[in-house]
A protein has these predicted regions:
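Short-chain dehydrogenase/reductase
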Residues: 61
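Hydrophobic alpha-helical segments within soluble ligand-binding/sensing domains
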Residues: 64-67
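Nucleotide and nucleotide-moiety/phosphate-recognizing core
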Residues: 4-58, 69, 73, 77-83, ...
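A hydrophobic, small-residue-rich beta->alpha segment in the mid-to-C-terminal subdomain
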Residues: 104-107
Length: 143
């Protein structure tokens, strides 16, 4: 999906690859549209944040997230903006794979729906204001 506003064009991409191969899709789109890494925003789930917590970063490592690791490996750097959305973590580490593929509870679904509605404001803030503004406005707030 492409969104235009003023002189800027925003391209929204949801890779149809497996999560741990997300980097293949991101690289193809970046190369085709000649998008630099610092103009790339990646939104992903994060086990290390509570459900509904948001953390925006302008660079960094994968934090053990296979999808982010794939992006770093495929594009050759880690200079892209990240919007991490908390999903909490299971009580037992051995249940992680099952946990990330499971459905949210009713209460969690309400929180996640609020995040989905908030996402456009976060992206708008990053693109049309600044990454600093977005981080100060949205980081660490449980929605």
């Amino acid at each position: 999906m492409c969104i235009r506003d003023r002189d800027r064009k925003l391209l929204l991409l949801k890779p149809q690859t497996y999560m741990n191969e997300s980097g293949v899709a991101v690289k193809k789109v970046k190369d085709f549209f000649k998008i630099s890494s610092n103009q790339t925003i990646v939104i992903y789930d994060d086990l290390d944040l509570q459900v509904g917590q948001i953390k925006i970063k302008d660079t960094g490592g994968s934090g053990g997230h296979n999808g982010v690791n794939s992006i770093i490996e495929n594009i050759g750097n880690n200079n892209f903006i990240r919007i991490r959305i908390g999903i909490g973590k299971p009580l037992e580490k051995s249940m992680t794979n099952k946990y990330v593929l499971s459905k949210f509870t009713k209460d969690e679904s309400k929180i996640v729906n609020n995040i989905n509605n908030l996402a456009k404001n976060i992206i708008y803030s990053i693109v049309f204001k600044s990454i600093s503004f977005a981080m100060n406005t949205f980081n660490s707030k449980i929605q």
